[in-house]
Amino acid sequence: MACGATLKRTLDFDPLLSPASPKRRRCAPLSAPASAAASPAAATAAAAASAAAASPQKYLRMEPSPFGDVSSRLTTEQILYNIKQEYKRMQKRRHLEASFQQADPGCTSDSQPHAFLISGPASPGTSSATSSPLKKEQPLFTLRQVGMICERLLKEREEKVREEYEEILNTKLAEQYDAFVKFTHDQIMRRYGEQPASYVS
């Protein structure tokens, strides 16, 4: 009898001792809604706190700089080529002005200072007509030196533009960040400001 009662007792309590008990299955769904049934005010406050913890510098670090992959940057060869082309255009312009002055010797007096500036002052023994702009001039810089000067000027200009861009971007990000924080605070106060405080919130 004792053995029979013992066996019967174990069979009766078998569902309770099993890991997959029906009572545990009934209680399991209740814990999930309880954790998910938090107050919307707490969720909104947590979102506002996480947003307040961020800063415009964080978004600036996440976004890659638009100056990183600039494909239109001039190389040294392109700078030298542009200088050569500009020098050729200047020579052609001077040649045309010299031929125009030779073809029309009776030019007006107002065009003479312009020719004087281009060709330079005439020597005491020669007249202004004989001092041609095509005269051999001694250059102050070589082509390589001019290219280096232009490259340095372009680099300085690029750095200045980059600094101005970063400053403007930081200012705009700070303004957007302040507007977002103010909007979130206004929404929280409008939705939950007049409600009485409870243990849930």
From Swiss-Prot:
How this protein is processed and modified after translation, per its record?
A: Polyubiquitinated. Polyubiquitination is dependent of UBR5 that extends pre-ubiquitinated AKIRIN2.
Motif Nuclear localization signal: which residue numbers? 23-28
Where the record places motif SYVS motif is 198-201
- Please name the GO terms of the biological process aspect recorded for this protein, alphabetically: adaptive immune response; cerebral cortex development; defense response to bacterium; embryo development ending in birth or egg hatching; innate immune response; nuclear protein quality control by the ubiquitin-proteasome system; positive regulation of adaptive immune response; positive regulation of B cell activation
- GO terms for CC? cytoplasm; membrane; nucleoplasm; nucleus; transcription repressor complex
Q: Which InterPro entries match?
A: Akirin (IPR024132)
Following inactivation of the gene, the phenotype reported is: Mice are embryonic lethal. Null mutant embryos could not be detected even on embryonic day 9.5. Conditional deletion in macrophages impairs proinflammatory cytokine production in response to Listeria infection and clearance of infecting bacteria. Conditional deletion in B-cells causes a decrease in the splenic B-cell numbers, leading to severe proliferation and activation defects in B-cells. The B-cell viability is also impaired, leading to decreased immune responses to T-dependent and T-independent antigens.
Q: Which family does it belong to?
A: Belongs to the akirin family.
| Keywords tagged on the record | Adaptive immunity, Cytoplasm, Developmental protein, Immunity, Innate immunity, Membrane, Nucleus, Phosphoprotein, Protein transport, Repressor, Transcription, Transcription regulation, Transport, Ubl conjugation
The protein's name in its UniProt record: Akirin-2
Quaternary structure (record) = Homodimer. Interacts with IPO9; the interaction is direct. Associates with 20S and 26S proteasomes. Interacts with SMARCD1; promoting SWI/SNF complex recruitment. Interacts with NFKBIZ. Interacts with YWHAB.
Q: Which spans are transmembrane here?
A: none
Q: Which residues carry this modification: Phosphoserine?
A: 18, 21, 55
**Single GO molecular function:** identical protein binding
- UniProt subcellular location: Nucleus; Cytoplasm; Membrane
Q: What is its main location?
A: nucleus
Miscellaneous notes? 'Akiraka ni suru' means 'making things clear' in Japanese. The name is given based on the presence of the clear nuclear localization signal.
Relate the protein's function as given in its record. Answer: Molecular adapter that acts as a bridge between a variety of multiprotein complexes, and which is involved in embryonic development, immunity, myogenesis and brain development. Plays a key role in nuclear protein degradation by promoting import of proteasomes into the nucleus: directly binds to fully assembled 20S proteasomes at one end and to nuclear import receptor IPO9 at the other end, bridging them together and mediating the import of pre-assembled proteasome complexes through the nuclear pore.
